[in-house]
């Protein structure tokens, strides 16, 4: 059964279940001819890089950053104009153009981007994503995030994102101290439940929210809500 927002509202009269998978569409994966010059060996700051000459399975973990304003409209290594509002990325050696799924390992959010540029060449960063991609991954304000990247081969199924973006909002508070106190009490109440979910405090614009999760699916989140009902007092928050 598909759980619509209305159905979830009825299921969670006290809790708010929300997902972050409703953001703008990712890059659409398609087979493309590799760019000749953008995939040649090159040197930056005395170090030589040799790009991959074919799209194949590849995974990598490390730090990601994003680039925006002052690069917007400039030419990329693939000869296109950089658009910070599109779902694109820069990588030192992945084929241009190619597609990867980028997953923020801290919050589980993911996005599919099209690699059309080279970089980043700063510190230990492995990928530069567009501002739009960084917004979807949830690290625009932080500037960097630890990520996992997975090469997508056209014609094959895209790697499935680990579903770590479904949470139940328990209650919101005006101060972090109040939220932490509530979290501690809720953790004690939920310790004996079958799901025994993780609890955390998230700072939002004007409040601190105690949330439970992540869960692998909306169905699993609804089950956890049913187990937790009566153990803690919750409020519905719009997702």
Curated annotation (Swiss-Prot):
Keywords: Cell wall biogenesis/degradation, Lyase, Signal. Lytic transglycosylase with a strong preference for naked glycan strands that lack stem peptides. The gene is rlpA. PANTHER family: ENDOLYTIC PEPTIDOGLYCAN TRANSGLYCOSYLASE RLPA. Its EC number is 4.2.2.-. SUPFAM superfamilies: Barwin-like endoglucanases (SSF50685). Pfam families: DPBB_1, SPOR. CDD domains: DPBB_RlpA-like. This is Endolytic peptidoglycan transglycosylase RlpA. InterPro entries: RlpA (IPR034718), RlpA-like_DPBB (IPR009009), RlpA-like_sf (IPR036908), RplA (IPR012997), SPOR-like_dom (IPR007730). GO terms for molecular function: lytic endotransglycosylase activity; peptidoglycan binding. It comes from Neisseria meningitidis serogroup A / serotype 4A (strain DSM 15465 / Z2491). Belongs to the RlpA family. Residues 1-25 form the signal peptide. Residues 160-239 form the SPOR domain. One of its GO terms (biological process) is peptidoglycan metabolic process.
